[in-house]
């Protein structure tokens, strides 16, 4: 290699480095992300509510009204399915991103119900992406039919039309919010086309096209004030130093790629879904907060290695009030699963952890934690199984930790927790090699203990 070439490469290297640094400096702030580390229902909404008091913008990036988050603010319990949990903070803007699929009747119903509980001025602080896809009633009918056809092998879908809507998106015949707000005759033609496609595939569903078009013409005007290009909005916010928090819906083990497929949802509930669901580049991501329930729960069917079909499972279900916000189904309950958490941490790159519902374990004399998986032949697994048949055939090895058998409900300082409760937290921390920053011991935001 000549001296000239070496010099040229050095100059180019400096040039590209300068360009990279310049691009990085475009953004004066970062995007922090809250993700569910198990199968959902970890308490992400409460964590978002706590953090939302310190940020300018809170975003939803994927999923639809199949998600359910409960937030207790000033003694009032709010249930959210499409709205970001941070919407209870009147000082921040809430964003529904392009990766979300929206059933407009459910969205407006959710707004009305929560306004009746005291949610105010939403019209000034909710922004909806013009690129978000719409969920129609026929998507929900199809969802129910497809689930019924599976018989004993059902996936436990919420029947909210989420999967069929994402299918329409993937096959490029879905309809986006922006199209509803454009020329209505173009929307009408596209709506008729997608309905007719579904009628050919599912002849038994009934759709009154004319009545639906009348309804959606009304919806168009109702939603119009909320809609804008959220991608430009978020990038402008970052360049201006605005703080942004993203609330992941569902959870890592329900991710379409990384979860226990096919017992998953139809979107990416991991860190990748944040980027594609909001139009953000990787360098904008700051903290990635994994929310971990102190035990494990799951709604619906699918493998669950540490599930306890006994009095322990019943106790966790009863003490934890484990009933789905969206489905109202009882959640299956079991011990904490370290291999599962190590896997979701690997995928998501958690920078810190929030443990929730530690107080539910208060009455137990001893607590088990799943620490490794073995095949039926005794071989230890060094990875999380990629198929449900492999996962269904594993045996869990448990560590047994002493309980604390005293109430933690009113503790507000980590050092005031019982010693065994502190040890339980440190046990998880050491096995994940990720710091635990918060511990939850109750429902409200005031019950979250800052560990450090």
Swiss-Prot record:
GO cellular component, one term: cytoplasm
Gene3D superfamilies: Adenylosuccinate Synthetase, subunit A, domain 1, Adenylosuccinate Synthetase, subunit A, domain 2, Adenylosuccinate Synthetase, subunit A, domain 3
InterPro entries: Adenylosuccin_syn_GTP-bd (IPR018220), Adenylosuccin_syn_Lys_AS (IPR033128), Adenylosuccinate_synth_dom1 (IPR042109), Adenylosuccinate_synth_dom2 (IPR042110), Adenylosuccinate_synth_dom3 (IPR042111), Adenylosuccinate_synthetase (IPR001114), P-loop_NTPase (IPR027417)
Function: Plays an important role in the de novo pathway and in the salvage pathway of purine nucleotide biosynthesis. Catalyzes the first committed step in the biosynthesis of AMP from IMP.
Stored SMART domains: Adenylsucc_synt
Keywords: Cytoplasm, GTP-binding, Ligase, Magnesium, Metal-binding, Nucleotide-binding, Purine biosynthesis
Organism in which the protein naturally occurs: Drosophila grimshawi
Residues binding IMP: 41-44, 66-69, 158, 172, 250, 265, 329
Cofactor note: Binds 1 Mg(2+) ion per subunit.
UniProt-recorded name of the protein: Adenylosuccinate synthetase
């Amino acid at each position: 290699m000549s001296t000239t070439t070496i010099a040229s490469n050095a100059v180019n290297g400096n040039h590209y480095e300068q360009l990279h640094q310049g691009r990085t400096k475009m953004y004066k702030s970062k995007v922090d992300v809250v993700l569910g580390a198990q199968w959902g229902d970890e308490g992400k909404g409460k964590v978002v509510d706590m953090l939302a008091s310190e940020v300018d913008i809170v975003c939803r990036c994927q999923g639809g009204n199949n998600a359910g988050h409960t937030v207790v603010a000033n003694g009032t319990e709010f249930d959210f399915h499409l709205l970001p949990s941070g919407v209870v903070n009147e000082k921040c803007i809430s964003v529904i991103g392009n990766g979300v699929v929206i059933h407009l009747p459910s969205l407006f119903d959710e707004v009305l119900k929560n306004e009746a509980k005291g949610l105010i001025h939403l019209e000034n602080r909710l922004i909806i992406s013009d690129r978000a896809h719409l969920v129609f009633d026929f998507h929900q009918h199809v969802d129910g039919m497809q689930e019924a056809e599976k018989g004993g092998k059902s996936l436990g879908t919420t029947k909210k039309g989420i999967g069929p809507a994402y299918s329409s998106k993937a096959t490029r015949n879905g309809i986006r919010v922006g199209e509803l707000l454009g020329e209505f005759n173009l929307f009408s033609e596209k709506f008729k086309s997608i309905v007719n496609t579904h009628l050919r595939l599912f002849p038994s569903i009934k759709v009154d096209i004319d009545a639906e078009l009348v309804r959606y013409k009304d919806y168009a005007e109702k939603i119009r004030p909320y809609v804008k290009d959220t991608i430009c909005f978020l990038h402008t916010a970052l360049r201006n130093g605005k703080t942004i928090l993203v609330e992941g819906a569902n959870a890592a083990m329900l991710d379409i790629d990384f979860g226990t497929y096919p017992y998953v949802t139809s979107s990416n509930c991991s860190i990748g879904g944040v980027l594609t669901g909001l139009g953000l580049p990787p360098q904008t991501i700051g903290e990635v907060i994994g929310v971990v329930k102190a035990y494990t729960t799951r709604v619906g069917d699918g493998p669950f290695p540490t599930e306890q079909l006994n009095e322990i499972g019943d106790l966790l279900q009863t003490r934890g009030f484990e009933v789905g916000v969206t489905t109202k189904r009882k959640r299956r309950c079991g011990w904490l699963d370290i291999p599962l958490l190590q896997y979701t941490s690997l995928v998501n790159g958690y920078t810190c952890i929030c443990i929730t519902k530690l107080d539910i374990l208060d009455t137990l004399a001893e607590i088990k934690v799943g620490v490794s998986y073995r095949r039926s032949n005794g071989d230890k697994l060094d990875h999380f199984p990629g198929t449900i048949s492999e996962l269904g055939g594993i045996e869990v090895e448990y560590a047994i930790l002493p309980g604390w058998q005293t109430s933690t409900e009113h503790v507000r300082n980590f050092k005031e927790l019982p010693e065994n409760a502190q040890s339980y937290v440190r046990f998880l921390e050491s096995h994940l090699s990720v710091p635990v920053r918060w511990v939850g011991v109750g429902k409200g935001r005031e019950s979250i203990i800052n560990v450090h």
